Each structure stands twice: as structure tokens, then as C-alpha cells.
């Protein structure tokens, strides 16, 4: 029996009525994962034994009728710590790391009765935009296995889009939830910085990282955010949760809402069919009663340059701990302490990770700090101020999630700058700490196009409201890839 076409609420009703058990649902999910895994490579670890133990305990305790996520399987990105389950960040450096604790987001999900069924593939240490830098091999796009799934949360997106799981967790440092959500035709939200605790997330860029949910629909995405969002004393940057229920505005109309469309988001480098899709979406919002007007975010063009200085500098610091002594892989060919450090890091890290560590170390080095890192921080402030000016007059910002649809595997691996530019529309949101969502908005060349909605801090309720209004009146979310069982 398969349940991949059932919504979370439908699954909840089946569990409460005892038509199925949590164990049966978990077993069916594990079978879904295994049957599609050879085609996708979306998982690093399938946690079958642990998941079935969890499911049995939930069945014995009884499904919580008031908790819609009780007994629901969950896939977790492999840089989010899971007690007793390998957490490798898709790196040789952490090939044998098994945490003895859960990340707060995972602990929160388990408290709601969710069952962790496995750890999803990703770009190594979340550094990459295509899902190809993983030590465990590239993940494939759910719609076309010759295309990239996006990154860095490649496996989490492909797993949901293909029907392996209904819900998954990812992390977003410069677009790593929204871009793969767009490439795979599902819903991915990067919450306001601090909404979801970073405790237990293997750090990349600490001022940018945020854990967030993937789901096939807007409401299911919001239900998962309800479960994982919390203030956390273990994360000094976490913020009080200001929204009791992220689904509360879903279903309300959007008449009179003001939506900004930045001219920079439809300019040079944007695929013409993607641009046309977003302009059509803008017209659709107007039909729903919203007011859509063109605005300018003049400093957004510097976002990629600013991001790669700041994120790489933070990564250079965060990844110092992986040295073959305190953490991680240790080279066997070392004859002294210096060689242990050098050889372990040279062999344990992949090329993209080493590239970013070098860039970050250079940016922070004496004589270059003011010219690079300090300057990047100043321009980051200008990007934040651009957003603040727009949000003084508008409720949300609309634009494409990515400049193009999913591209061929191995087509940009040898051109890091081109790969970095694929995140030019998502990066500014992280630099400003804002929430942003990607939802399906159409197709180009048979591949999904993602629409991005950006809001001021702590506006997730409004983002979900507007996203759900679009979803309910278009139906793009109902189209599924062949591997799911739908029509491509």
C-alpha cells in the first residue's frame, strides 16, 4: 500500500481512525524511499530500524488526535543532527559522525510525534547550488534525472517531489531551500532568521543559516513550520515565536494587498520563459485583488559578491574545527602533527569546500579585511535598507526563485562563478534575514518554474496566505513527475 498521494491531514484522519497504523505508514514510506532511491540518490542514510522503533512506540502510546503530525514520517537534511543516526553533511570529513543528540528542530518534530525515516543527500557542508558536491554522489532532479535538483538541500527537495516522503527539513544559507524547491516543483520556505533554532545544525554561515520545511503544498509546509519553530536558549540568535499558528491566514483573500515586483529581478540573466511566467503570475495576483507595482532594489546586484565574501569567511571559521584531531576524518599517511592537519583537511574536504575556505581565509587575512569583509558588511547594510524602504509601502515582494529552470548535470561544475550566479535572486533574502518562499508557478521546457514571495521579518503568516491563494487558483502543485506516479 502506498500513501504518497495523501495529504498530511488525510493521513492524520487515517491514523486517528486506525485504518492504518504509524508502523504501516512508516513501512510504506520506507518502501517508497527504497523503490525510487536508485533513480534519485536523494538519501545518504535510510534510518529503517530507528524509524520502526519510533513508529511502534507511537502506536503503543496512541495517535494524538489533536496533533496533525503525530505518526507522520519526516526526512531530515544530512547537516541537521539526529540522535543515533549518521550526520555526515555529505562529506568524507564526517563519514562516521553519529550525534548523541537531536538538533532542536528535530527534537521539536519528534515531540509532535514525527518519525525520522532518513537523512537526505546534499551539497557537501551545504556548499553548492546543484546537489553535485556531495561525497556520496549527485542527487537527480525528480522531473528529469539528467537535470540537477538544485542545492544545497537537493535530497530533501527531490524526496518530497518524487513521493518518497511527504515532508522534509532543509537548511537555507543563500537559497538552499527555495532554489531546489523551485527546480523540483514543490513548496520550500526559508523562515525569518532566528525563527527555527540553529542548535544542532552543522554551521556554514552562522549569520545566514536557517532551517526550514519542504512540502508539496503551502498548508502542509506551514504545518511543519508550526512543529519546528521555537525560541531556544541553546541558540543565542533564536527569536521568540511571534506567530501561534502559521496556517491561520491560509484561505483568506488577498484583496487590497500591495505586492512589489523589483525590476532587478526580471532583468539581465533571467530566462525569458521564467520572466514570462512571473509576469503572468503578477497578472494572476491582480485578478485576485492584489495591487502589483514595479519597484527597485538597487543594491541587490551586489548580493552575490557580498554573500560569497561573508559566507565564505564564516565557513572558514566554522570549519576550522574539522582537523583530524578533534573532529572528523584523519589521514592515514601523516607522519607528524602538521601533516595530520594538512592531509586530513586536504583529503576530507571536497573541492568546493576547499575553494570557499580559501576565499574566506583570504577575505579575513591581514591587509585584506577592510577591502573585502568589512566592505561586504557595509554593502549588506545597504541591501537591508533597500528591503526596508520597499516594505514601508508594500506587503510582499514577488519575483522568480531562480534565473532559469533546472540545468543539465555536470554543466556548471567547472564554472564556479556561473554556479554562484544561479543564487542571485535568493541570496539577498538571507543577507537581510527575511522570510521567503518558493511555490510552483508554471513550467518551461517541461520543468517547474518557481515563484518567490519575500516578506518583512516575521511575516510568514502573510506569505503563506498569499502563496495559498495563488496555489488554490492555479493548481500547478497538482502536477507531479513521472517517478511520483503523475503525468510529466
From Swiss-Prot:
Pfam families registered for this protein in UniProt: Amidase
Protein known as: Glutamyl-tRNA(Gln) amidotransferase subunit A
Origin superkingdom: Bacteria
Catalytic activity: L-glutamyl-tRNA(Gln) + L-glutamine + ATP + H2O = L-glutaminyl-tRNA(Gln) + L-glutamate + ADP + phosphate + H(+)
Active site, UniProt feature: 77, 152, 176
Keyword Protein biosynthesis: yes
Organism: Streptococcus pneumoniae (strain Taiwan19F-14)
NCBIfam families: gatA (TIGR00132)
Species classification: Bacteria, Bacillati, Bacillota, Bacilli, Lactobacillales
Keyword vocabulary terms for this entry: ATP-binding, Ligase, Nucleotide-binding, Protein biosynthesis
Subunit structure: Heterotrimer of A, B and C subunits.
One of the record's GO molecular function terms: glutaminyl-tRNA synthase (glutamine-hydrolyzing) activity
